[in-house]
Amino acid sequence: MPLPKIATPLYELELPSTKQTIKYRPFLVKEEKLLVLALESEDTKQITTAIKTVIKNCISTRGVKVEDLPTFDIEYLFLNIRGKSVGEEVELSIIAPDDGVTPIPVNIDLDEIKVVENKEHNKQIRLDDSLMMEMKYPSLDQFIKNNFDFDDNSNVDRSFELIASCIDKIFNEEEVWSTADVSKKEVVEFLEQMNSAQFKQIEKFFETMPKLSHTLEVVNPKTKVKSTVVLEGLSSFFG
């Protein structure tokens, strides 16, 4: 007689980028083992790949392509899956901002951590009186490729490739040019034609992108100085 199956609960959350409600389950022991091995390797690319694999396994809603999700969706999803799997509170050690050396232990409820949106963020960029550009968010795969693949290309080249991959279309009142219809080289050459003011608008798009963020107040036990600390990005919430 085969052993019985263990029932796994399902939970719901709303993806920050699309507002789509999806269903997910906690990760299993075999998936936790995969994550532990990746974390022990201290290899950022391996950790990110493990996170993506676990998320794929845990999402039960059909049609969700993890590879295409923005980085902040991936981070938010994983944080919630982790919370339902091993506990919704995480213990961290934060270095006191006032002296830069004293560790402060804190407990953070994962339910309080949200993706924060900047009011100044805009996916559309005006290049001149007639020409505009619409951006799209970098996927996790693009983020990995441009940050953790070290080849002969310079950092500047990788940055331009990342930006080029995040341009969705260029348009005016009469015509639309989809970047899916042209080569990456052509898009990079288009970027290189921009002046400094135009390029700064692209930088602003990335700087104001939605991000996983949590603000808390800490008190240095030695100096009694109270400080405000902002934690951003998934790595900030690993104990």
Regions found by a protein language model. Give the residues of each.
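Long C-terminal interaction/binding lobes of large macromolecular proteins
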Residues: M1-G239
